[in-house]
């Protein structure tokens, strides 16, 4: 179980001191793709940011098309088809919204800020909180499993996780001993990050590095970009990278897949 592994393996390296407001859940493009006053829509195109692998996202979102058609019908709109796709990157979704090749999208707050000249927020989301919310990394490494609570939250933290590789465990041991990591410690690790418009997967960790070391993710010697957090977790489990960055509830979200899907060790 991942619970056991949390006690000795996949430690939280650092908890970035940034809390981010939840993403602009549903964003509409600023360009009108139907005739004025028309309530007939042949295809309503929704693009999703790739925070998980495309297959998982599309399976989970399968009921969404029918729900949107029903809701729009109640508002007097006749929608022929709802097309749901997953973008190749966070920026790709923002670009599609800006260009009008997507009518609406589920994006991060960071992506919205980048493309807000052409997009408007339609809905924002809340999510379930988790039972840990500390700025002290050792509190996340106390051997107890992160779990979702019944409370809703309007923010979440960005964290940096160390994996089972030799370097990852070296960094985790230093943090758990109460020692401050140096820039050389961090620069000697291989990092997996998300695209540059991802809030928890790039922007906030980069700001944390700047505030603490005067450096950014772009200054790290060994960085690979993942197409989803699922890919980052898989790379971490396989020891292909030493460190990943992402949202604070990553371990709770991916616990069931750590060994069965990602090949992580107990």
Regions found by a protein language model. Name each.
Residues 46-47, 53-80, 207:
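Short, polar/charged alpha-helical segment
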